[in-house]
């Protein structure tokens, strides 16, 4: 049976991002946007879309051949009754549609990252999805790229001993919009450990200063999606993750007996094994055949719907990544203090993302 899909939010990630992918990359493969992804995935058909901007909605639906279109997502959910919904609104406008989608009784959800911009909204979304036990997948998609899958299999095979730490490049981009990708990839390569504590120093992106806003109810917000100067995340099983000045989206996994390095957002990998203190040798990294990460995500969601298998980027994976990002903000506001997770005070937010 072909499932009915709908998209809420007809912006860049809903489909037009594919226009930007005009370069060769070993793992960055179209289709990337949601509408082209549904068109390339068997067992699902995109039948409806919603956006509050009627002109944008109609232009987008004309381009992607979507007949049913709504400026009110509630009407879409009530009239179309989709099986699967993508929520691709901006992050600051994502929580309410997501909760509405959950409560409408859909069978599966594909949400973009970052999930939301406040801890209160994070708690609302997690509670709603958990109460309905709905399969969910997430737009931090590097864990679905074949290069990262190959790296995870290489590490799991024990060629370098047990992983001990991840170093990720945070020299460019912003924490919620950009580095949610590479933080999630690092967690995937480390085996998805639970975060225990965070320390961070942040700044504004580019020339902008990072403003801090305190509210009367003890909440705190930063006025833009911040850049990461430095961050350290303590993980269970004595693992750790450090955000460094490596080039943006580069990653190193430090193991007992060597290092695996990913360059250029999974463009290339290099492996060095340590035989003795001053005796290191390069190891070959396996070849891989790239595929669309978006299609892989959608296939994962369909398997969960039909077979009940957990998704690779499920609710706990999403929650962990968001808890880390909010804790970075809390740590920065408190002068880089160590913040234990999960945070008991839930008043952190990011104003403009």
Model regions and ranges:
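Proline-aspartate-enriched helix->loop->beta-strand connector
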Residues: 66, 81-82, 106, 195
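Rossmann-like NAD(P)H-binding beta-loop-alpha module
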Residues: 146-165
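Rossmann-like dinucleotide-binding domain that binds NAD(P)(H)
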Residues: 162-248, 316, 348
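NAD(P)-dinucleotide binding in Rossmann-like oxidoreductases
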Residues: 222-225, 232-296, 314, 328, ...
